[in-house]
Amino acid sequence: MASTSSGGRGEDGRPPQMQPVRSMSRKMTRAGTMMIEHPNEDERPIDSELVPSSLASIAPILRVANDIDQDNARVAYLCRFHAFEKAHRMDPTSSGRGVRQFKTYLLHKLEEEEEITEHMLAKSDPREIQLYYQTFYENNIQDGEGKKTPEEMAKLYQIATVLYDVLKTVVPQARIDDKTLRYAKEVERKKEQYEHYNILPLYALGAKTAVMELPEIKAAILAVCNVDNLPRPRFHSASANLDEVDRERGRSFNDILEWLALVFGFQRGNVANQREHLILLLANIDVRKRDLENYVEIKPSTVRKLMEKYFKNYNSWCKYLRCDSYLRFPAGCDKQQLSLLYIGLYLLIWGEASNVRFMPECLCYIFHNMANEVHGILFGNVYPVTGDTYEAGAPDEEAFLRNVITPIYQVLRKEVRRNKNGKASHSKWRNYDDLNEYFWDKRCFRLKWPMNFKADFFIHTDEISQVPNQRHDQVSHGKRKPKTNFVEARTFWNLYRSFDRMWMFLVLSLQTMIIVAWHPSGSILAIFTEDVFRNVLTIFITSAFLNLLQATLDLVLSFGAWKSLKFSQIMRYITKFLMAAMWAIMLPITYSKSVQNPTGLIKFFSSWVGSWLHRSLYDYAIALYVLPNILAAVFFLLPPLRRIMERSNMRIVTLIMWWAQPKLYIGRGMHEEMFALFKYTFFWVMLLLSKLAFSYYVEILPLVNPTKLIWDMHVVNYEWHEFFPNATHNIGVIIAIWGPIVLVYFMDTQIWYAIFSTLFGGIYGAFSHLGEIRTLGMLRSRFKVVPSAFCSKLTPLPLGHAKRKHLDETVDEKDIARFSQMWNKFIHTMRDEDLISDRERDLLLVPSSSGDVTVVQWPPFLLASKIPIALDMAKDFKGKEDVDLFKKIKSEYYMHYAVVEAYETVRDIIYGLLQDESDKRIVREICYEVDISIQQHRFLSEFRMTGMPLLSDKLEKFLKILLSDYEEDDYKSQIINVLQDIIEIITQDVMVNGHEILERAHLQSGDIESDKKEQRFEKIDLSLTQNISWREKVVRLLLLLTVKESAINIPQSLEARRRMTFFANSLFMNMPDAPRVRDMLSFSVLTPYYKEDVLYSEEELNKENEDGITILFYLQRIYPEEWSNYCERVNDLKRNLSEKDKAEQLRQWVSYRGQTLSRTVRGMMYYRVALELQCFQEYTEENATNGGYLPSESNEDDRKAFSDRARALADLKFTYVVSCQVYGNQKKSSESRDRSCYNNILQLMLKYPSLRVAYIDEREETVNGKSQKVFYSVLLKGCDKLDEEIYRIKLPGPPTEIGEGKPENQNHAIIFTRGEALQTIDMNQDNYFEECFKMRNVLQEFDEGRRGKRNPTILGLREHIFTGSVSSLAWFMSNQETSFVTIGQRVLANPLRVRFHYGHPDIFDRIFHITRGGISKASKIINLSEDIFAGYNSTLRGGYVTHHEYIQAGKGRDVGMNQISFFEAKVANGNGEQTLSRDVYRLGRRFDFYRMLSFYFTTVGFYFSSMITVLTVYVFLYGRLYLVLSGLEKNILQSASVHESNALEQALAAQSVFQLGFLMVLPMVMEIGLEKGFRTALGDFIIMQLQLASVFFTFQLGTKAHYFGRTILHGGSKYRATGRGFVVFHAKFAENYRLYSRSHFVKGLELVILLVVYQVYGTSYRSSSTYMYITFSMWFLVTSWLFAPFIFNPSGFEWQKTVDDWTDWKRWMGNRGGIGIVLDKSWESWWDIEQEHLKHTNLRGRVLEILLALRFLLYQYGIVYHLNIARRHTTFLVYGLSWAILLSVLLVLKMVSMGRRKFGTDFQVMFRILKALLFLGFLSVMTVLFVVCGLTISDLFASILAFLPTGWAILLIGQALRSVFKGLGFWDSVKELGRAYEYIMGLVIFTPIAVLSWFPFVSEFQTRLLFNQAFSRGLQISMILAGKKDKETPSTKYLGHTEESFGLEHDTNTFNHYYLWT
């Protein structure tokens, strides 16, 4: 063996080169290690975690080598050698990725160890390893049986198994001794019983864990292991060649899931996972409200309930398809066993389904057939004979994956390749929904079972290209499969199609109001006059045409799915269209006969129809037309009837409903109960009445008279070439005036919604008791009832106790005891989080020794200054009666408690210290005198109050000495001296007859010596000073005596105050009663993680930016109190932290203030802490303890038993899984950041043993001689110093390739979650201990019977945004987000009933959702906003969502301008995609009218309204442009009749830009007012306006409108990573330009030109005040869009930064693009990417883009006629000449450009002459124009205004027709034209910034503006702006200093600018 290793060669046959290998070795070991300890030595243990994926099986061997290295280095060497040999056998050619490097590294390591390792037990390797194996077995396994935990035994058996494998390679079989063989057989026999487990060590022998001793677990295991009467699986004849292992596999099974696995071929990991899953579910459901005595088996009702939950969707599917359910229970069968078989089968299918989990009805189909097989196997042949009908054995454990899941996965994968990474149209490929909805039709049974892979579902014409040079993801083109039921067409018509009833209502209401307003009276009552009413009836004609439009859209947009539709559905579409067309013809015809004296078109119709039609036929037609609407209204008022009919599968009902609503599997019966219906109907009726009244009186009525005047006016003096000079009635003017008003009419419902939701939300919040305790003063005033409220709401009622109806003032000591345990833990967690200091902690704690005094001991912060005030009160008391003094003291509630407690505590402390009995007697007599004098009302006569202050001072000194260091020499003498002083003051200064007590003591002691007095009180017991509870008592008394008014502001931290007040307030809100821990619902938390920060490294903390600012330094300034508290904690001598521990604590302190995974995990793990505390409270319920958190220390066994029991119950109820998608890749990565993330995640697993990490493992495996990637879902836990694998489940392929990343990441890990509820928590969230305590209350919201028959399926929780203190932007976002997650969602849930799932931290009904497609949707692009689709899906499938505000979680938000814009763009993109989705269409069509309105205005309607707001500005200004350039406005305004009426000017000013800003702020003000007080809300509102919040929100309005509109027009949606940095930073001008050029700057400059033209050409006849009145809001919008990115950009106006930005922008503009040039390096690359959406848009998108670009031609057309050179000619020739001039200029520029390229090098002189000639020619032309033709300077500027937009139009058309221009050879010209325009725009925007940067005060003002909120929080930005921190002090030394040592060098010559580092 030794010779083999020393003379070994590499796999290439050459001897190893030692030096390079050493280098590589050191490099590899430094790349990362699994060990938490990081030794500095070069020689480090082999990192078993860096094994290449293709050699994964050798990793356990290397782990064992590392484990035993210290014990026996030689055996460890042999293990490594075995690993090397095995690796070489697995991959002899080293073809796998990383294999060659790893083998070389390992070989070098072996060569080194061969020389240095020595034998320890024998002289040869064979003997050495045998002896070690035997010793290891005897010392660890044999002795450990029954003593060690199952986890420890699992590791030992794993090591023993590997050692024996190594032993067999080292020792020949014949030389293995009997003892070793015997031990090896024992290991082999028992190792399966000691595998690593998740929660339940099901088959572990020996020491029992507490969780396995729970009776509910035992009963559940008994039920699952009931395999009686299950036939043994028999293998098919093809399996005759199975090896012995497989044969053994078929002979035995321990439970029903193993039996199912043997029958169907489920994977071992899947079986183990679902076995535990099922046992935990059964145990948790069964134990609820059950007596634990005689608990031996599961109740039948438990299994029945679980069956109902799991198979509700399956049974519904069977009924829908009218097929028999295969959940069959033959007579005489074991119903419970069969039920569990069905549940187990479903779970195993679901657990292995991978991406198919998103297709719930596909799973129903699979289960349907497999359940039929189970029934056939069990009951098909009662007497088994040869040749069974069903073959009962699967060939291997991957049979199900290979034969069922993988084929469906391959269909998904082929379809998603058609998507072309989001560039293909949705209609070109089938997504998850399309493939799932295939199973909504009975045609799905054509797939048969086993599935026929030649069926239509599997045959795909687009196979992967086999061309060698073609990329793997490309597909060849062929005939595609049709969409199923719905086609996601990219058009704005989707908004009308989905919400047609709303648009019809608005259009018909508008028509009605215009008709009524047109009446001369203008009164709304005019509708009752006959002629007006007759005209109003024309709305039905409009309705008919709108219905026709709807039917046409349905017909056209669904055409791509016709091949998948039933004939009845197609017929419905066609019939609907024909009926709509018929009404659109019939109603106008019948109306024409009803009109008296018809004219025009009506006369034509009337004469055509003839006289046989009676005049009232129109009335009959209307009655017939509205009949369906009347029936719909009746059904609306009877929701139960509609619900029954929609859910019915009876053919007659289906036929009746066929016309009203097409039959669909989902979206049936979504109607609410009557009271809910009344609430949201009332809300919308009130809103619509207000909206219509406002629209009528403010928008429509004022325009009617001016419209009539303009209608009758005749204009002849046009100022341009008018194409229709003889047109009557000025239609263009009327359109220009009415256009913006109509748009505002359609949009302002959104504003009314904001107003009404604010009012309703505020009222509902007030009735929900929100904000009743919002300050420390309020908390102190109500704290006396907080304990009873806590016990009433958050603790379960003891058995036999009635629920309290009212909270009374009396304080129950049991309440105080239970409350104190939770409260003190809450305070301690805040101390651990450094939110409070040690002193604040002591002031806030409720003492644990409550039984020592006769009164309730309140926290010292309530009793602050009560004792000093009482002393002053007593000293200055002038009365004679005791009663008056005590009445005065008792008038202050807490003062009485403080006085009594102080007295009794002083007594106990002094009495406890004394040893001498006579001394104790003196104290007893003093106390007796005090007590008896109080009882007899002679206290004032027996005691002098003037001596009390002196006594208080001595007591304070006494207590401080008691708490001082015990080691001091004079400690005892000091105590004795002060104690003697105290007794002397009491007896001589305070007591009138105190000397008598001392004299009696002398007499009783038998000693009358006069000097004996001096020897009293010398014998004291100092051992008490070491007693923790006694010291707590001393500390508390000292606080009572010394703390003054300063405690009123305790705690200092605003966050601590917020948490305390919110928790106390929530106790008075409505919430379900708390169940016992055993009775509560079990739940899991799931967090998806990709590559975000886990824990900041020391390097990241101390990395400086260019201004010398580090993260650490910044956080010290922004959180000064918390930093001070941290320093106090880590420097506490009692903790005795090492420097290494302090460095780790520092990393955690910083990370817990960022948006990191470690913060999230810490917050979620508070659930376990809360559960364990709740277990303790229930444990001590019968004998309520006044003690602390843990039972008495006297009985260690009881404490351990309790602790184990609490942990067992916590395991039973709570699971936390973090889905770290790329953890496996990070593990093997050589990049430092990936390795850091991996190590930090591992550290989290080790810190929190119950934390589980799931990841997607990517391995290279050899299949059929070829290496291919194989994917697994893996679950890990921390164990010892490494992670340990629990479950491994093979996947059909890469799961994240099919859908969006985050939902796929959640989906792969959801199988590892447990329980009945699932909380989704994002990576930027936090949680709080006190909120975790309410979790069992929240989960009761799912409980049956709380809301009748219908239970919620998603519980919405409120969030606290913790990033609001960084900057003003962060504050704006925090307020906006807070208002949405509170008042916004409050109204959505109640009364509107349209709350969905908006992200996290909502809680899902887990079983409901895993049987209906999961907790999100994942189809690429269309489900970009994956979270909200979970809410849509839940609602469509019969669930509903609630919202609860008595509990909250923390959440971080983006804090910089660009990050916020990225976020807004992402959400706008998502809403654009939602508009196209089938979910929105179905909800819009299937909700009743008022819920549909709620749904629209709270989802896609909000974004469409934002777009309409922007569009209104454009329509208004282009209308003005038309009026002013044509001369119509001048003619109309100068008309006498119009001039006298100011109504027109009022109409022109009716804009709504500010209204959406108001819409944003109003809910914020209401919510802040509710929770902080309306004075605070008003102050915040004013501050926000001063900080330009309106500018910010107006800017974001443009972001929403741009991205929403572009998504619907062209697509291009994508996930945008926003970044979660600490602070904002200075963004360069070029970066801002790239981000906002198209979304804001281009639009802003267009509006500037519009406003300038409108002003310039209307000045002569319009006053400037009128102009500003009309356009002020638009100028505000323009300013916001152009300059907001720079206003909110730190150091945006600092001169040096401005200079650098200009240089950077010029460089970027000048750089040429090309392949590989990124967009931030070259303008050309960016410009190309910016047009990406146009490359992939459809023909409709291109046509729309060109039509929109044509608007820019209007400027040139209008302005050229106003030039002086045109001399008022209005012929078309003028416009033609302007085009000739423009084209000439472009041609000359093109010639110069071509000349430069062709002649610039070889014919330089000639080129210069050419340019000179052109210049001279230009001068000549200009001279002629000025002198001869009358050209003026103003004409030049006007020409610029005219021709710039035209050039931009040419550019836009060129981009839309890119391929055409490229074919013509003009593309380079288009590009250069684009570059010229970018230069112009950049210069225009940059100039004001440069000018403002000249003035230093602008930069200072901007800093104040940005960081004012941080100033008020104590952020010393002025210091950061002024200089840098002390470079002499390295960050590692910060740990030893207090906050004050972190000063800044004040240097007047240092930086006067600042930007924060991120």
From Swiss-Prot:
EC id: 2.4.1.34
Catalyses which reaction(s): [(1->3)-beta-D-glucosyl](n) + UDP-alpha-D-glucose = [(1->3)-beta-D-glucosyl](n+1) + UDP + H(+)
Keyword Cytoplasm applies: no
Main subcellular localisation: membrane
Membrane-topology descriptor: Multi-pass membrane protein
Region (Disordered), start-end ranges: 1-29
Subcellular localization: Cell membrane
Superkingdom, taxonomy of origin: Eukaryota
Keywords, comma-separated and alphabetical: Cell membrane, Cell shape, Cell wall biogenesis/degradation, Glycosyltransferase, Membrane, Transferase, Transmembrane, Transmembrane helix
Entry's transmembrane regions: 505-525, 536-556, 570-590, 621-641, 674-694, 731-751, 1497-1517, 1548-1568, 1577-1597, 1641-1661, 1668-1688, 1743-1763, 1772-1792, 1813-1833, 1836-1856, 1879-1899
Function: Involved in callose synthesis at the forming cell plate during cytokinesis. During plant growth and development, callose is found as a transitory component of the cell plate in dividing cells, is a major component of pollen mother cell walls and pollen tubes, and is found as a structural component of plasmodesmatal canals.
Family in the record: Belongs to the glycosyltransferase 48 family.
Name of the protein: Callose synthase 7
Source species taxonomy: Eukaryota, Viridiplantae, Streptophyta, Embryophyta, Tracheophyta
Chain's gene name: CALS7
